[in-house]
Amino acid sequence: MAPKKDAKKPEPPKKAEPAPAPAPAPEPPKADAVDLSGVKLDFTQDQMEDYREAFLLFDRVGDSKVAYNQIADIMRALGQNPTNKEVTKILGNPTADDMVNKRVDFEGFLPMLQVVINNPNKATYDDYVEGLRVFDKEGNGTVMGAELRIVLSTLGEKMSEAEIDALMQGQEDENGCVNYEAFVKHIMSV
């Protein structure tokens, strides 16, 4: 007699288990806020008067204060060129609501300005020209305006179309090219 074969019962189909939820992406580390309490102001009296005058031009309410979202514009009006990221860090990484609703007075603004002025990583005219020279395919001192618009809207601190239009106004020649040395002089004077 042949040995008995074990008749295996068919296994019931396995229930598909839902895949575990992916772990939430870790929040990017926030840059530490700048401690403004230890900043030593190094301005002359004439500079302080000029800075106060420019600061007060941005006061829309009449309380001698400006909104956080105006700080970068004031600094640029005073000849500085901080990135939005730098200003956000100086302001203590505020929320979008804080950028609109929080206000700072002139005495609170001065240490912020001093931090930007003391920043050793400022780009120079030559740095900007060298960066744009990469796009000068013909080596004639010009770049295509359309290409420059794409660069401004997609690389680094992306600019809005309205900001690009304002910056590019009157910069393109009849062929749609921009003399980048003149363009850099223009943007550094704005």
UniProtKB/Swiss-Prot annotation:
Occurrences of domain EF-hand (ranges): 46-81, 123-158
Chain spans, region Disordered: 1-33
Single GO term (MF): calcium ion binding
Residue spans of biased composition, Pro residues class: 19-28
InterPro entries, per the entry: CALM/Myosin/TropC-like, EF-hand-dom_pair, EF_hand_dom
Entry comment describing in which tissues the protein is expressed: Expressed in fast muscle fibers during skeletal muscle differentiation.
Basic and acidic residues: compositionally biased ranges: 1-17
Effect of a null allele: Morphant embryos have curved bodies, bent tails and a marked reduction in touch-evoked escape response. Muscle structure is altered and myofibers are sparse and disordered.
SUPFAM superfamilies: EF-hand
GO BP of this protein: skeletal muscle tissue development
Gene Ontology cellular component annotations, sorted alphabetically: contractile muscle fiber; myosin II complex
UniProt keyword list: Repeat
Self-association and partners: Myosin is a hexamer of 2 heavy chains and 4 light chains. Does not bind calcium.
Function, in words: Non-regulatory myosin light chain required for proper formation and/or maintenance of myofibers, and thus appropriate muscle function.
Name the record gives this protein: Myosin, light chain 1, alkali; skeletal, fast
Organism classification: Eukaryota, Metazoa, Chordata, Craniata, Vertebrata
